[in-house]
């Protein structure tokens, strides 16, 4: 009986250690986030009101739900991606790809409607895009299934760091994204590389 209890305790201990190790990349309840790499740290702060979600892939550094605005049917989603040094493409290639994920109801070119900006945040070069229309991005890479969401807004940014680019993508109903405009701007301004 003693041997069975000791064996059970060992199994439970191993399971708890494995569970704890498996959550190394999990997001803390705190709004303060950091992603540590061999060449330094990227630090950022998620604004009040955003709901931290468990990242659904290893390329997602952080994932948030931004609660819907009154009148909208669903929440917006914001994901911070990191693919590694020299991975994920150039700033312009990503800006162009994001713009192509929004179609205009009148058939006009989304590129002419998109607002782009280049800025410097805490010494980091940041390229941004903001475009509204019908969201047609693929639901998951390689799935062959695509969104077809009218009156959506996509705000995205490429943050260039010494260890590689980070990619921020916010997509959701236009009213919901507008509700969170200031907190999104604050989020981008919070990025620091230490």
Question: Which residues does each PLM region occupy?
Answer:
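Signature of long, low-cysteine stretches enriched in small and polar/charged residues
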Residues: 95-159
């Amino acid at each position: 009986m003693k041997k069975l209890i000791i064996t059970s305790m060992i199994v439970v201990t191993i399971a708890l250690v494995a569970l704890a190790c498996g959550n190394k990349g999990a997001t803390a309840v705190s709004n303060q986030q950091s992603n540590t790499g061999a060449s330094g740290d990227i630090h950022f702060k998620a604004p009040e009101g955003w709901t931290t979600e468990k990242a659904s892939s290893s390329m997602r550094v952080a994932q948030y739900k931004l609660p819907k605005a009154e009148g909208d049917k669903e929440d917006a989603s914001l994901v911070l991606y990191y693919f590694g040094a020299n991975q994920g493409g150039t700033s312009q290639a990503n800006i162009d790809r994001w713009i192509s994920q929004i179609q205009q109801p009148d058939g006009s070119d989304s590129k002419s409607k998109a607002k782009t900006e280049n800025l410097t945040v805490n010494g980091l070069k940041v390229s941004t895009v903001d475009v509204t229309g019908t969201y047609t991005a693929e639901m998951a890479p390689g799935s062959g299934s695509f969104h077809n969401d009218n009156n959506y807004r996509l705000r995205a940014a490429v943050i260039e760091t010494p260890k590689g680019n980070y990619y921020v993508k916010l997509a959701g109903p236009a009213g919901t994204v507008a509700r969170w405009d200031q907190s999104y701007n604050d989020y981008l301004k919070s990025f620091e590389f230490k």
